[in-house]
Amino acid sequence: KRQLLARLAGELGEKQWLEDRVRYTTATEAAKLMRSSSPSGRRDYVDGKKEPKKIPANRAMQWGHEREDHILSEASRMSGIAIEHNHQVAVKSEDTRFAATPDGIGDDVVAEAKTFNIKVTDFLPDQYFYQMQWQMFVCNKKQCLYAYEVHEDYKPVVDEETGSSVHYRIIDRDDAVIKAMVSEVELALEQMNEVKESSDQIDDLIFKLAIA
């Protein structure tokens, strides 16, 4: 059973949001680590935890936020899969270091909504695939209802066959991929602990020299 923080993600103040960024490994972070699978990627992860920063909103992000509810509702109707829209942070009950915020949650499924410019040719980039795998891992689900809408200059493009601007795919959980992702995250967490221990030792040395 998933554990949900008693707090809506949309209601988080910047201070609390930054604290959560330090406390948990999110789906976005886990996906980036998996794509990189390198020491430099782990350094970026550690740096992000040391000095978390808000991602500045842009037009594309705002459009995605505005269209999210419609995309999920339409994908639910088209697929016949019942989902509830979600704005809460899910924390894995077996390991509270890991968290995710899927856009929707159903009985045995999570849901993720995206928007794409019509010029895009890859509607399932690795970053999104790994992100959904992490969401299924955290929420203990077997599938993800992946819904996306194509637009041209922020005007939805309706598909002639379906009569809808929304498309969907069912993404199955891949435990082998999840295992590899957890391994990458564990390596990054080990590196972060080493950096913290080194920093603590330096602080102790400075303190001892100061009082000597």
Where are these regions (language model features)?
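A generic signature of intrinsically disordered, low-complexity regions enriched in glycine/proline
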Residues: Y24, G48, D107, A176-I178, ...
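Short, well-ordered alpha-helical scaffold segments within catalytic/effector domains
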Residues: E68-L72, F129-M132
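C-terminal accessory segment of soluble enzyme catalytic cores
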Residues: D204-A212
